From Swiss-Prot:
Organism from which the protein derives: Anaplasma phagocytophilum (strain HZ)
GO biological process annotation, one example: mismatch repair
PANTHER family according to UniProt: RIBONUCLEASE H2 SUBUNIT A, RIBONUCLEASE HII
GO molecular function annotation: manganese ion binding; RNA binding; RNA-DNA hybrid ribonuclease activity
Protein name in UniProt: Ribonuclease HII
Family in the record: Belongs to the RNase HII family.
Length: 210
């Protein structure tokens, strides 16, 4: 279970404001990448028990924790659009989303940012990257939940525009049903055309039209 050991080891003093950051949608083939930043005041987790990596939670439990996190922590979210993913790359876009999430936190100061992953996050705040951070740091685990639910809700809304791609179920990831729909209907403006499955479909469609 994630805990505060990383927050303790990297911060200086119990009054340090340590924020966890995580993103969701890195490997998706459609939709934006979404990040969340979470600060747990006074390390109060009694109201938000059993926080863990969002991938290890059932949707029902994740949604319940999401509501508690919004009520009992300081949260910020940010995203990078499909155009930004295509213009730069998914890593750069993910870090853009993370910085925006941090900027959207209602905090007067941030002493340290804990980031899930191995890459350094360049921002105005000092940061530490933690591999598998969502399994180790409770702040990052909380951020993973907020980011996941935020993006899932977003993809369910986008599903209404393009129901044939089943984004209400796959959230833009390359499931078999999504790939089949991509082959049958082609790519939408919300698909990441530089990603291999989408790029392959576009090339295949062009070859068939010749």
């Amino acid at each position: 279970m994630p805990n505060f050991s990383y927050e303790d080891s990297f911060s200086h003093g119990s009054n340090a404001i340590v924020v966890g950051v995580d993103e969701v949608g890195y490997g998706s083939i459609a939709g934006p990448v979404v990040a969340a930043a979470v600060y747990i005041p006074d390390r109060n987790v009694e109201c938000i028990p059993n926080i863990k990596d969002s991938k290890l939670l059932t949707p029902k439990k994740r949604d319940a924790l999401y509501k508690e996190l919004l009520s009992h922590t300081v949260c910020g979210t940010g995203l990078a659009s499909i155009d930004e993913i295509e213009e730069h790359n998914i890593l750069v876009a993910s870090h853009m989303a993370m910085r925006r999430a941090l900027e959207n936190l209602n905090l007067q100061r941030i002493d340290l940012v804990l980031v899930d992953g191995s890459r350094e996050l360049k921002s105005q705040w000092p940061s530490k990257s933690i591999i598998n951070g969502d399994e180790l740091s409770i702040s990052i685990a909380a951020a993973s939940i907020v980011a996941k639910v935020t993006r899932d809700n977003m993809m369910r809304e986008l599903h209404d525009q393009y129901p044939e791609y089943h984004w209400n179920k796959n959230c833009g990831y390359g499931t078999a049903a999504h790939i089949l729909a991509l082959k049958q209907h082609g790519a939408t403006p919300l698909h990441r055309k530089t990603f291999a499955p989408v790029k392959k479909c576009i090339i295949s469609t062009k070859n068939q039209d010749k």
